[in-house]
């Protein structure tokens, strides 16, 4: 055997040769650390977010074609890249050379905010264009299905990509065949004045053309290598692992005989996550990526044979081609497989994962195995002993020894038979999110009838997600043989299958009753599908489906999206070069798109740098009996392990009223609490050592996880907050009706794309320390680090260039991590880097507070609410953090848009044994307002009115007073409501929804509209201070720094717009480097929607100071340039630097009196959403959303609209699909994108229309603008209440007329189980207390 151990591949056109390759090295760290190509980002490490997307290209010497495909660099072992060409975002374009059209368009179409996900987005689209220069919208959405974005809401990204499509900008999906952009801007009414409608915020005609001839060519050397068919086996090894890549089938069998336990990997999408997340280790890996026999495609007389080495994407293309060429009766299996291949994972994973690997892995929630299991498929196996064929059946899927592969065998190919006439195959799945999400339950079903008699001859039904393996209901199917296909058979089948496919109440994954319901709901769908086909085949003998049932068979989800935007006109008196009010591109947009934007972990390694990782508690409430560090300390590369004992008297810091310990001392109070910190010379060694730290615990009582448990144990933080207005008790005596209710609202993970990251560098002189950190609050980082090191603050400088998303989650916990990291750096005199993995970040940092809201409302029969008594309980977690502030803001904002003449609201932050929850975009308002809106909805139901009528009758009117006695002018609130009513055609569509619901039993539509009043301010003048520093250099260029953090909201862009206006110079003349405590000290936190407000006023002040100094010089030489004026000023000894300062808004709140002026102004808005739900599965589709917002005078409509729609999508996720799951022991189950689902492109509204009200004056703010970062989150609940409306319609048709309270998030499980029917009544129910549930509702 001729062996080679040298690895050769190309990266961005440059040859890479590695002689000593570690098989455990993945491409992502290799690119970032070894090649310093940091454009490719770490987002999750498991192929679930797309941030690390690159293009892999290979030449096939047989077809003479080059195949380009997207791939997740975090899962690709570099050993698998021999002979491949890797292209990263740096390789397609750069600001130093030329940017690629993809990079240009995604930037100029405002498709970047924080920019962290952008390189992955760019590479997914770039790869698509390499294969399809003029893609369809279907191809476009498929290509982006594996990429997540937490900021933009996806609309601008889709708009950018549409410019490459065959019919650019067209929605391509309207029922009448007319694009939405050609329908008079979708028929949206124009406002009277001050605004204009545009489908885009960019000029398409200015874009660079896409020219395929200018792309990087595939390296000729690799083509020659491939043509030579080198017969050298590749062997790579390290101390821990060997990697074998055979070149022939015979050699593969020899390796498998020699190493029978070694996994055979193609794409590493199954083995890779097991190694990373489950700690599985394989000393030998076999990679047969060059063996032709594994990529066979054979069309035989009885079916199709597909090689086990084919990627799922290749299988999808092959099957799509087959179904085009063969009659439908032969391709039933292939249609079913295609249905699931379209939603299975993302494009990257589908291009990496192999068919054989997917089958052999036998994951219990596999989407393909249930279909293959019912289709009489067989597996062709091979070993040194010879060939063997086994059926792909339940015995194989459950790994029965006599039906499984032998250790020395490999899977060569799969036989998938053609279907026959009178044979029907279908596939079903339901997931938390429709694409790139593991199924909750999936199924494959096949039935074969006698010739035209409707009698079942064969029946096979398999399910995934309901057991440890794919389950086949063979006993039930056998009992149904010989029966007629009718409703009697269906009823018997449901009962048989529920009895056979049984689920324990404690089954992993939870959702047990939902899963039981899906089992028979899918069967009913199959029954309807087959019945419909039978009717078409033989109209005489088979009855038609009832018209009301036909919609049950229609697919909910559309891949086509259209949008219109309406933003403000620029006044005729404004100078043409004044950028204020123009849709200016995010000034880092191009750098985001080229990968040149530097984030914290992109900074180069410092000499002798160490890496720090944490060991966290595995118990929720326990005493630490002992910590054994000996084995971990003895490992190679480990420098130190620090515990609370090392930090001693600096192991805590008090920011609010309660100090929080950095590292646990004698007790732990939640799973995920920091216990000790491991310091090593590499990230790999630090993480390996952390796993060897042994901690012995002794559990303590009580274990408090839920709000109800905290109430029971009187466990809450002090003080209780209370807000009272009017006389509630007296008002209850005079109302017509009184109702009481409660609603639970789950928490939310920030899921910023860039995890917690920092690099602390000792300067080696005067004890100075530089802290580079991804944070919203540099001053706090400076203070906590200085306190920990017992240094004055002037020795510690904190630097933040940009943050890859934050949403409130990069403040207090970031400070604790930074303090420990700085302590380690100071102790050892070496730079220390700390970057949390996604799972660590989700476990440690907490998120949005879960809420329990209780309400008692007194109201008149016309819907007027005269008395409201509310109680808010938040699940604060184990420490105070910012929970009291969240409760306060929730109470102050709970009235939303409504005037309640008599109001009492109390709030408690509940202490529990969960990681501390913290600030999150909206800061208590999304929870508090949902409670209020739920009460409104229930009042409407009691009065027999629509919720919208009750909303408008209780809404603030013109000048009024809030419960805390602050004056409010609600004119723009009413205008937003009216404009949204008109823009959405609410009245007409409400009639259409009711008509649809009357005609359809299993699908229902809902329509809901909600108003928004969002107070903006931080509650005190001190919190609203801001400063800025502006320098003018002698060449006329300007450098501006300020205290705000750029975290995607475009604050730096707006600040440069301010400088441009105030100094009357082009924006290109102004530069902004980042934020540092060295240049702007004592800056407040960036949050609360006021970052641009406050810092903009400080920048404006600095500029006006400079302009006042320079006015005499400018007036003497009005035609001069800034270079002339700066030089003259210098010659005359005039200071060309100025500090700007803003004292903060006049704001205060007296909680003892329950009154004050805590806010500077109010943002108003309204949103209307229409949804369609599938009553059988709980699935939903957002058909259309219309949003109208009052933004004052927009500084930058592109950025402002981006904030509105990004917040809306994040809020939609909060209220619908984002679900945190904790075990009864307090362990977080949802620790990554595989388990926790944020909205993806498939969740976008099919139609999205956003309008800004005409300009309105607001004298105290920056150019009369308003901060919009947080307010739009709440508008996502328009989707929640539209679903509520649809569920109500379903329940009423089923005779369920009682009160309906739906908790948030309104997941598929809750939707389905609320749509009660004969199937939900049929399932068995477990008695509470008779089992230990998998998860506990928090």
UniProtKB/Swiss-Prot annotation:
EC number(s) stated in the UniProt entry for this protein: 1.2.3.1, 1.17.3.-
Location relative to the cell: Cytoplasm
Cofactor info, note text: Binds 2 [2Fe-2S] clusters per subunit.
Keyword field contains Iron-sulfur: yes
Record-linked InterPro entries: 2Fe-2S-bd, 2Fe-2S-bd_dom_sf, 2Fe-2S_ferredoxin-like_sf, 2Fe-2S_ferredoxin-type, 2Fe2S_fd_BS, Ald_Oxase/Xan_DH_a/b, Ald_Oxase/Xan_DH_a/b_sf, Ald_Oxase/xanthine_DH-like
GO molecular function, one term: flavin adenine dinucleotide binding
Biological process per Gene Ontology, one example term: xenobiotic metabolic process
Key words of the record: 2Fe-2S, Cytoplasm, FAD, Flavoprotein, Iron, Iron-sulfur, Lipid metabolism, Metal-binding, Molybdenum, Oxidoreductase, Phosphoprotein
Tissues where the protein occurs: Abundant in liver, expressed in adipose tissue and at lower levels in lung, skeletal muscle, pancreas. In contrast to mice, no significant gender difference in AOX1 expression level (at protein level).
Catalyzed chemical reaction(s): an aldehyde + O2 + H2O = a carboxylate + H2O2 + H(+); retinal + O2 + H2O = retinoate + H2O2 + H(+)
Active site: 1270 (proton acceptor)
SMART domains to which the protein is assigned, alphabetical: Ald_Xan_dh_C (SM01008), CO_deh_flav_C (SM01092)
Residues at which Mo-molybdopterin binds: 113, 151, 806-807, 1047, 1088-1091, 1203, 1268
Cofactor(s) the record lists: [2Fe-2S] cluster; FAD; Mo-molybdopterin
Family label: Belongs to the xanthine dehydrogenase family.
Subunit structure: Homodimer.
NCBIfam families noted in UniProt: mam_aldehyde_ox
The protein's name in its UniProt record: Aldehyde oxidase
Organism expressing this protein natively: Homo sapiens (Human)
Biological classification of the source: Eukaryota, Metazoa, Chordata, Craniata, Vertebrata
Name of the gene this protein is made from: AOX1
